[in-house]
Amino acid sequence: RVLFRSGCRVARAEKSPHAEKLFQWLERGWHAGMEWMARSPERRTDPAEVLPGCRSVICLSYDYDSPGRRPEREGSICLYAHGKDYHGILEEKLADLQELLSIYGGKQKGYVDSGPVMERDHAEACGLGWRGKSGLIVRRKGGSRFFIATLLTTLELEPDAPVANGCGSCRRCAALCPTGAIMGNGQVDAGRCLSYWTIEHRGAIPEEIRPLIGTRLYGCDTCVMVCPWNGKPLPDVDERFRMSRL
């Protein structure tokens, strides 16, 4: 675990306890134009459907840089996108981990925000953090400013325990969301989310959404910026994920 500077924890490979919530989210159309989310949702909620014989899910977290104030007149880009593309970097970390595990045999399959894996469910189960009202995984040290990578394995590993939810009665993310996209129960209506419209959506942005975008160019980050757990700088951020002035 010392190889992974932000966090490395293990969850049991179990069916998602939030499977029914996912199905309801899809039925409500809250996935907007992300049609891949609606493909084989049952497979997405069960690691054994992705990797037969899966017994454990290893979750890696990797911090990205702290929020910085920017003049309102400047176009804003979400915090995580200021550094290098995290996919390739975390895939290298997964490859290192797979090489270590190969000593013990078994089969492994890794994903970085790209496969039919409910990584936030696994991250919550193993105590990487708790699920905030915004749907993001939040930690007491570092808030929600981190990427998640998952490695499914057929090896039986000792699981870590979940942590207590630290949101309490706070609803800042939901109350200050510029479009009311945060439902406050850990779910987001992507059809209202500015990150969806400025990152995931392909095509023209609806006229009723355009005035709400303001100076945002890519992403939103309001829910990240207003979260009390994100107030302190992160001391040990990989230089590749440091913010730079574009």
Predicted region positions:
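Glycine-rich phosphate/pyrophosphate-binding loop
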Residues: 245-246
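Auxiliary alpha/beta "docking" domains used to position bulky ligands
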Residues: 1-166, 205, 214-215
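Iron-sulfur cluster-binding cysteine motifs and their immediate structural context
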Residues: 7, 172-196, 202, 213-240
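Long, well-ordered alpha-helical scaffolding segments within enzyme catalytic domains
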Residues: 164-169, 178
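A short, flexible beta-alpha/helix-coil linker loop
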Residues: 158, 199-200
